[in-house]
Amino acid sequence: MNRSFHKSQTLRFYDCSAVEVKSKFGAEFRRFSLDRHKPGKFEDFYKLVVHTHHISNSDVTIGYADVHGDLLPINNDDNFCKAVSSANPLLRVFIQKREEAERGSLGAGSLCRRRRALGALRDEGPRRRAHLDIGLPRDFRPVSSIIDVDLVPETHRRVRLHRHGCEKPLGFYIRDGASVRVTPHGLEKVPGIFISRMVPGGLAESTGLLAVNDEVLEVNGIEVAGKTLDQVTDMMIANSHNLIVTVKPANQRNNVVRGGRALGSSGPPSDGTAGFVGPPAPRVLQNFHPDEAESDEDNDVVIEGTLEPARPPQTPGAPAGSLSRVNGAGLAQRLQRDLALDGGLQRLLSSLRADPRHSLALPPGGVEEHGPAVTL
């Protein structure tokens, strides 16, 4: 049996008031004891440690391993007494040079990281990437946040900008323009306020939540509809310390997705007007495939009505249902041609709003009261 081990066991069993200390500096180990009930002051303990290891001329830091395996510092009388009282039964002390300790080696789980590093040195396999020690943030503060996600519509976004008394400006410019609204009477152009430019390095650009051509709808809960550009500017300046802006993003792909349904992109408007997303048109474009226009199982165009429409005269040799295929193929070509041109979405809506009796060659009186049901 080792003599030092036998001596330490004797010290533990016969002197309960003594705490055995095992200090480590580099590859050197030293053992000594302290009085559990009267450990003394930290300055005396520091002098004892540096004298024991003969490092009086070095600037070192002292840490200890607690019962959970974390390496905690000893730098005042309070945590020194805590370290001595928590020793069960051995107090393990680690001594480091101050430049090594400032790299962030102290803290929770530091001993586990140190053991993994030693194991990696013994491993003969492929060398892993070196672990990067990230220190604690010195100036950590929020810059922006998205609020009221459950209250605003899916196509809108409510952003809070935090300035925290800094001199950095908000970092965006606004302009007036025309926005397109979908009303029961059709599409109408109304005045609107838009973000025209972002200042590089500003607060708004650093958030990543605002972009050019985003339409401003509210400023701190006040709607901007009916207000001039100067009035909206004054509202933003007055609330610049805690600005809450409700916008309609020009790019809907980066918006919050709810219920497993992705939002399409309206794209930045080319003529200075706000883009809009119509519910029926994107659904038709997503579900339509050119191969379905030539299917023999289902009719491409289905007309539902209470009256039986008069069947137009067929040419000799034409099979039954050829008119529906021709009309369906013509409609598919029109959809592809309109999508290839600029502003294809608006042309598609205008073509779908046209009277279907002209495009489908239906006789008058062959449609029910609420109009035909066209299914692609």
Swiss-Prot record:
Ranges where the Pseudo-CRIB domain occurs: 134-151
Region (Interaction with PARD3 and CDC42): 127-254
Segments of this protein annotated with the region Disordered: 356-376
Cysteines joined through disulfide linkages: none
Stored CDD domains: PB1_Par6, PDZ_Par6-like
Tissues with expression: Widely expressed, with a higher expression in fetal and adult kidney.
SMART domains according to UniProt: PB1 (SM00666), PDZ (SM00228)
GO cellular component, one term: cell cortex
Basic and acidic residues bias (residue ranges): 367-376
Cell location: Cytoplasm; Cell membrane; Cell junction, Tight junction
BP terms from Gene Ontology: cell division; centrosome cycle; establishment or maintenance of cell polarity; establishment or maintenance of epithelial cell apical/basal polarity; regulation of cellular localization
Domain of life of the native organism: Eukaryota
Ranges for domain PDZ: 158-251
Domain PB1: 18-98
Keywords: Cell cycle, Cell division, Cell junction, Cell membrane, Cytoplasm, Membrane, Tight junction
Principal localisation: cytoplasm
Domain notes: The pseudo-CRIB domain together with the PDZ domain is required for the interaction with Rho small GTPases.
Record family assignment: Belongs to the PAR6 family.
Chain's role: Adapter protein involved in asymmetrical cell division and cell polarization processes. May play a role in the formation of epithelial tight junctions. The PARD6-PARD3 complex links GTP-bound Rho small GTPases to atypical protein kinase C proteins.
Subunit comment: Interacts with PARD3. Interacts with GTP-bound forms of CDC42, RHOQ/TC10 and RAC1. Interacts with the N-terminal part of PRKCI and PRKCZ.
Protein name: Partitioning defective 6 homolog gamma
